[in-house]
Amino acid sequence: MKRSKHDPLEIPSYQLVDAARYLHVPYQTLHSWTTGASPSKAVIKIASLKPPTLSFMDLVECWVLAGLRHRERISMPKVRSAVDTLRLKYNSRHPLAEKEFETDGIDLFIREAMVLVNVSRSAQFVIRDVVEAHLRRIERDDTGLACRLFPFTTSAQSKSKVDAPKIIVIDPLISFGRPVLRGTAICTSVLASRHRGGDSIPSLAREYGRKQIEIKQAIEWERAAA
């Protein structure tokens, strides 16, 4: 689906260093995915190259890609080929963010990316499970467009991610797309900064009218992203 460059979902909003933090992906990895050795070799076609800046839709695609490459070191050329196949199939600039990817797209990606790669069938099931967990953190509007992303909080790292609580949200229409506590415009970076400055979790919870566990998770998430 083609959208206007002025669409909030398509506006360049996240520089690489910030996007890497939000996705908990190494900077060099994200750089490889989005710019590569040259723009033509990039897996994700980002909104702006000078400087490299991602739109919300780009961010969502990188989130899905992080799930796809979570367990198996699939070569980048094969990943790029698989994404290009999906791009043609869906006639979309952002195939990994499309609603259709949640149905037949995952299996197609795995088939395309793993041709001639020695990955067991059981490993493919694991990859599918990880990707589905990532996809469930994407909220869509009535038309199927990705509109919010709920990154995994620290508590979700050691538990099943499928039903992990959605405490932090990235919404392009709230706080300029910066991570906030769900249901608020309270930036997680502000909470982390104030905590570093000496404010306790209980005092922050009282001031903002939120549960202590939410404040704690936001601070720990920011710490892990640093």
Name each model-derived stretch.
Residues 1-6, 165-186:
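Short, Lys/Arg-enriched anionic-surface-contact patches
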Residues 5-30:
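Polyanion-binding surface elements
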Residues 21-25, 36, 206-211:
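A short, basic/aromatic helix-end/turn motif that makes direct DNA contacts
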Residues 26-48:
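Major-groove DNA-recognition helix of helix-turn-helix-type DNA-binding domains
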Residues 41-66:
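Short helix-start
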Residues 74-142:
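Charged mid-protein connector segments
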Residues 130-176:
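Basic, low-complexity segments
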Residues 184-226:
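Long, charge-rich, low-complexity alpha-helical segments
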